[in-house]
Design a protein with these regions (language model features):
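Gly/Ser/Thr-rich beta-alpha loop segments that engage phosphate groups in nucleotides
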Residues: 5, 44, 217-218
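Catalytic-pocket segment enriched in acidic/His residues
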Residues: 141-143, 148-244
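Glycine-enriched loop-and-adjacent helix/strand subsegments that border the catalytic/binding cleft
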Residues: 18-22, 27-189
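Single conserved hydrophobic/aromatic residue that forms the stacking wall/gate
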Residues: 1-13
Length: 244
């Protein structure tokens, strides 16, 4: 019984964190020429969940004003303590009918119309180590999502083995980490399925043309001014930019 009450308290606290995120979202949407273009999923690796002391991912929003297609330069003045994360992203095929939820893995064939390379810049505006910040603070600040960069080359999902696809992160032409899509809940599609069903429980459908950034394939790396960043997705392409 004590365990049940503890889980209920944790769920209530988590709901409050998302309520704060929702209020923040309204502030973002008040900005000129801004709208929500999709969702990000965070904490999709076992290591990240252990570090944050949680047992499932969390989500945040992607915004038009805080995203770009293949940007060349990123200005450090707009960030506090940024980290770069190479991610596989997906596009929603049609408005999702959440009355059919919960969806199964096989349903993703008709829910999604392709994947592409992306990079998320996460930024923690707390003067504490991540382990002390905690997942709830990260959730309330939009999952720490600060900027999102995407490749325009849409690829058929069936053409990629997402159970085992290698992704490398280079900083100043040096490979700092080689990751794999299996680091993202064993397969990034699992993160997508979790998100769609989680949102459906809240009565929130994803809409045609929106994006889902599924979680980092590598470790997150801090970036500093005067750095050249490259996320190499092999045959899927790459994303390169300078952090100035």
């Amino acid at each position: 019984l004590h365990g049940v009450h503890r889980r209920q308290r944790q769920m209530c606290i988590r709901d409050r964190a998302y309520a704060i995120q929702d209020n923040l979202t309204l502030r973002y949407l008040e900005l000129k020429d801004n709208f929500c273009i999709g969702k990000k999923v965070g904490c999709t690796s076992v290591a990240a969940q252990k570090q944050m002391n949680i047992k499932e991912p969390f989500h945040g929003n992607l915004f038009y004003r805080y995203s770009s297609r293949n940007i060349n330069l990123l200005n450090s003045k707009n960030f506090f303590e940024p980290y770069v994360e190479p991610e596989i992203s997906f596009r929603i095929k049609d408005d999702i009918n959440i009355s059919k939820a919960p969806f199964k893995f096989k349903d993703l064939d008709y829910l999604l119309d392709g994947l592409f390379c992306s990079v998320e810049i996460v930024d923690f505006r707390f003067r504490k180590p991540l382990s002390e910040i905690g997942a709830l603070n990260v959730i309330s600040t939009n999952g720490a999502s600060e900027f999102w960069i995407r490749n325009e080359n849409l690829i058929k999902i069936k053409d990629v083995d997402l159970n085992n696809f290698e992704v490398s992160l280079l900083i100043n032409d040096t490979i700092v980490d080689t990751g794999n899509t299996k680091n993202v809940l064993d397969n990034p599609l699992n993160a997508v399925l979790w998100l769609i069903n989680n949102l459906a429980e809240k009565g929130e459908p994803m809409l045609k043309g929106q994006f889902i950034s599924s979680g980092s394939c590598t470790k997150a790396f801090r970036i500093y001014p005067k750095s050249k960043i490259k996320a190499d997705f092999n045959q899927l392409g790459s994303i390169e930019f300078e952090y100035i």
